[in-house]
Amino acid sequence: MKRAADGMEKPKFLTREEREKLALERRQAAVTDQRRSALDLLQSLPRPPPPPPPPLSNPPRDSSSSHHRDSSDRDRDRDRDRDRDRDRDRDRERRRDDDSRRDRDRDRDRDRGDSSRRDRDRERGDRDRDRDRERGDRDRERGDREKDRLEKMAEREREKELDAIKEQYLGSKKPKKRVIKPSEKFRFSFDWENTEDTSRDMNSLYQSPHEARLLYGRGFLAGIDRREQKKVAAAHEKETRAEQRRKAGLDDRPEDDAVDKKEADAAAKYDAFDMRVDRHWTQKSLDEMTERDWRIFREDFNISYKGSKVPRPMRKWSESKLGTELLRAVEKAGYKEPSPIQMASIPLGLQQRDVIGIAETGSGKTAAFVLPMLSYITRLPPISEENEAEGPYAVVMAPTRELAQQIEEETVKFATYLGIKVVSIVGGQSIEEQGFKIRQGCEVVIATPGRLLDCLERRYAVLNQCNYVVLDEADRMIDMGFEPQVVGVLDAMPSSNLKPENEDEELDAKTIYRTTYMFSATMPPAVERLARKYLRNPVVVTIGTAGKATDLITQNVIMTKESEKMSRLQKILTDLGDKPAIVFCNTKKSADARAKDLDKAGFRVTTLHGGKSQEQRETSLDGFRNRRFTVLVATDVAGRGIDIPDVAHVINYEMPSSIDTYTHRIGRTGRAGKKGLATSFLTLENTDIFFDLKQMLIQSNSPVPPELARHEASKFKPGSVPDRPPRRNDTVYATH
């Protein structure tokens, strides 16, 4: 049983070190046994006899003893040799054992070192093979990716080419408009988002928030302009893509250029339609002004244009691009800020555009045409003996001598630092003396039409090099019967320097073309005839005050109740037909509700307010401009800075709290000289605007509702204390 139990014991596995140790022990035991057996063998051999005693001196010599002595000597020598050989063999055997043991130890150490070295070499070889394998895999993956990229690029190029061919021969498919389900369209939203907060429009604190006054850096804030950074990053990414395409050998196709141009136009349109109201235009630099800021600027100064390729107006004298001498003269004359007509006309005159200015007397129009005229003359050679016989460089005509002399004084004042000679030719003075002044040479002639024509007919003056003409108060000159004289003077000028009638035609850089300024308070038919004959692609600049800007707008004010507003609104829109109309509300919630009601009533309506995204605003405005929608329900976001042409009717569904907001709202109609209609629903809750509204209606000769005229709030300005009636009107009651 014990042996069976021993046989069932589990085998014991030895490590490499244990096996080496066990082998060494076994070898040591074998060597020890071998030595022990050799020693036993030596001990078993017979010992040699002890050496004989030394011989005595002079021993007896006989033959037998010498023979015995010789044999014993031989035996002794033999034994000695045998012992010596045995010791030598034993030492040799011992050395051999030591050498074999040393060799075994050395071989064992060598084997151990070789095995570890082989292990290290094997591991290093494995690592090298793995590294080479990974490098090869990466190269293959990179090659596969590059191949896939090139295949995809080639596939895209083929698809673009096929699309271009299909579009050329089959025509492009018109994108289908996504139909919105009524359940999604009229889904009620229970919460208002933070972006729909209208407190910015109502609270002045939100309109001018406090900003950090940092003393370093430039840009939006301390040199960090997020919008500018996005533009720079987009431009850098575009350049990187173009460089990659050039390295890959891919040429830009016209289709790609068209796509890039379309994207650039879209980006420019987005920047121009910037609806973010962060600062007023007075707090922005010239580069930061957006299209909306320029529209608000023009509305603030009641500047309107009619024409093509109109430059931006100037906001201050430092932005006028006038010469240093002229700016010094302007500063010396005490002109701190330019007037609206100067803001609009001077940039046009510096571009030598023909201008028709409609402005009242005293609006500063003299400087509006004198400064560009002097800037033009400074670019010409000075008048000398060689060219003084050819006449002046510029002519200004005025209807009366008083006005001509006034213009002369202003011109001399502005030409102080230029050395330009100015001569006036008016009636009541000697014509010979005036002709003598002209023959002496002058750059500018200021005259009345009749006297100037007399000088031309008598050969006192010529206009061979006159290329700058100003007609001040042209309508008044026509009314006074000076039309033939004006035509005669204009015909006396060389006609070869007239600009081509087609404004797209390229102008000759070496030719000096005529520039004509015409200022008039009105545009009668005779003035229009002059403009059509002598002006080339003129820009009409209209300047007027807020009250006069509303003369073209018929204002209707209806006193009503809140419950009657919607029915009245639907009746007005029904009578209007397909003509565009804008309905103004005070809040975004009210605008959405009114739009929903009008949509249910069958009107094509869209909304515009601060709660909409940039894309939604553009879509709404484009749809309204393109007549896909006939009604635009908006808040005061559309009241300023947004130009919507041909608006036939403006309806104030909810009256604003200030008269300025009311003025800007109704200013959406009656634009560009066209007549417009404005209707306002007034309730007894709008008492804050009663007084100012009544005054505006009276000034514009519009009907005032009896309820508004009799109301107590319309008799006194809000916040003022009414005067006490005279004491004589008091009734005194006697007491008994």
Swiss-Prot record:
It is found in: Cytoplasm; Nucleus. One of its GO terms (cellular component) is catalytic step 2 spliceosome. GO terms for biological process: mRNA splicing, via spliceosome. Residues 46-58 have a biased composition (Pro residues). It catalyses: ATP + H2O = ADP + phosphate + H(+). A motif (DEAD box) lies at residues 472-475. A motif (Q motif) lies at residues 315-343. It is an enzyme of class 3 (hydrolase). Residues 346-541 form the Helicase ATP-binding domain. ATP binds at A359, E360, T361, G362, S363, G364, K365, T366. Its main location: cytoplasm. Residues 25-38, 64-166, 231-252 have a biased composition (Basic and acidic residues). Residues 14-38, 137-167 form a coiled coil. One of its GO terms (molecular function) is mRNA binding. Pfam families: DDX23 (PF25430), DEAD (PF00270), Helicase_C (PF00271). Its EC number is 3.6.4.13. Residues 25-178, 231-263, 704-736 are annotated as: Disordered. Residues 568-712 form the Helicase C-terminal domain. It comes from the Eukaryota. Keywords: ATP-binding, Coiled coil, Cytoplasm, Helicase, Hydrolase, mRNA processing, mRNA splicing, Nucleotide-binding, Nucleus, RNA-binding. ATP-dependent RNA helicase involved in mRNA splicing. May destabilize the U1/5'-splice site duplex to permit an effective competition for the 5'-splice site by the U6 snRNA, resulting in the switch between U1 and U6 at the 5'-splice site. May also act to unwind the U4/U6 base-pairing interaction in the U4/U6/U5 snRNP, facilitating the first covalent step of splicing. The Q motif is unique to and characteristic of the DEAD box family of RNA helicases and controls ATP binding and hydrolysis. Belongs to the DEAD box helicase family. DDX23/PRP28 subfamily. This is DEAD-box ATP-dependent RNA helicase 21.
